[in-house]
Design a protein with these regions (language model features):
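Bacterial Sec-dependent signal peptides at the C-terminal "C-region" and cleavage site
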Residues: 5-14
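Aromatic-lined carbohydrate-binding surfaces of glycoside hydrolases
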Residues: 38-43, 48, 52-64, 68, ...
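Auxiliary, metal-adjacent structural segments of Zn-dependent hydrolase domains
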Residues: 23-42, 94
Length: 293
């Protein structure tokens, strides 16, 4: 007699796996007491929390929604919170409290933006993947789904400026040092405390690949940079007819640190934009949302 046993257990979705991995990172000793279930998608993000057989079951339309549900449970039933600092522990009760009734919530807004250019110039230039991993967990727990993602863009620019004829020395001198890159990226300042080491460019490129991959795992659409007109002054050597203007001094810095802008009506502008977006997409993919300043 041949007996075939069929399991009713379905394979976890990628969103469910992402959530299980999150709890294993944050409080591994409790991971088996949580279950996650991705359910049908509707027009709005939503989550549902309920007790089920001694475990906390969290349902939602995607990982981001389930993460928000987890955060609600932690805040209101465990009376704890998760910080974005990687070395902070999450203080959990000895016994997980079970919700007495089902909780259902729906997101009030579709797009939830986070971060700004300056944020990337405080301690972030020195962050490792572990620091970013914790911040992305925190972002998911708080429902962020449109994070600014500008790490590693200098590696893209290095490729673009090289393709347009600038030398390695010209390109790396054009960038500021790591702590001042936000103000370089905002077109305020060039050259200050440069050049950037090529090794640093490569490290940040690898880090950005990890960042955007994890953000997308939690249903986020990273906002990547685009070209706004800021160019190295040395570009004039290769394109002497280009309409490049020197900007006024900024923040009390000497004239030699002033930035330069290409006229958006100059045909070279579209060429640079196309090259940048193509190179960036090769490295980091795209969700077709960009920020330029």
């Amino acid at each position: 007699m041949l007996i075939v046993l069929c399991s009713s257990c379905k394979e976890s979705t990628e969103d469910e796996k992402a959530m299980q991995q999150m709890v294993e990172r944050l409080f591994p000793e409790y991971a088996s007491q949580f279950s996650f279930e991705q359910s049908e998608k509707i027009d709005k993000d939503w989550y549902e929390i309920e007790a089920q057989g001694g475990t906390v079951r969290i349902r939602g339309n995607n990982a981001n929604s389930m993460a928000v549900g987890l955060n609600y449970y932690l805040n209101h039933y465990c009376l704890t919170s998760v910080s974005w600092y990687v070395n902070d522990t999450v203080e959990m009760p000895e016994v997980l409290p079970m919700p007495p009734a089902k909780i259902i919530s729906t997101a009030r807004c579709k797009n939830r933006f986070f971060l700004n250019y300056c944020t990337f110039g405080y301690t972030m230039p020195w962050w490792t993947w572990k620091d970013w991993e914790r911040l992305i967990d925190w972002m998911a727990l708080n429902g962020i789904n449109m994070p600014l993602a500008i790490t590693g863009q200098e590696s893209v620019w290095y490729r673009v400026w090289t393709k347009l004829g600038l030398t390695d020395e010209e390109i790396r001198n054009y960038f500021t040092g790591p702590a001042h890159l936000p103000w370089h990226r905002m077109s305020n300042l060039d050259y200050w405390q440069g050049p950037l080491p090529k090794e640093w460019l490569d490290t940040q490129e690898a880090l950005q690949k990890q960042i955007v991959a994890r953000e997308r795992q939690f249903n986020m659409r990273p906002i990547l940079p685009a070209f706004a007109g800021h160019v190295p002054s040395e570009l004039k050597r290769i394109y002497p007819e280009a309409k490049i203007s020197r900007m006024s001094s900024w923040g009390g810095f000497e004239d030699k640190y002033r930035s330069h802008f290409l006229d958006p009506l100059d045909p070279l502008f579209a060429t640079i934009q196309k090259e940048f977006l193509e190179e960036q997409t090769k490295l980091f993919g795209t969700d077709h949302i960009y920020g330029a300043i």
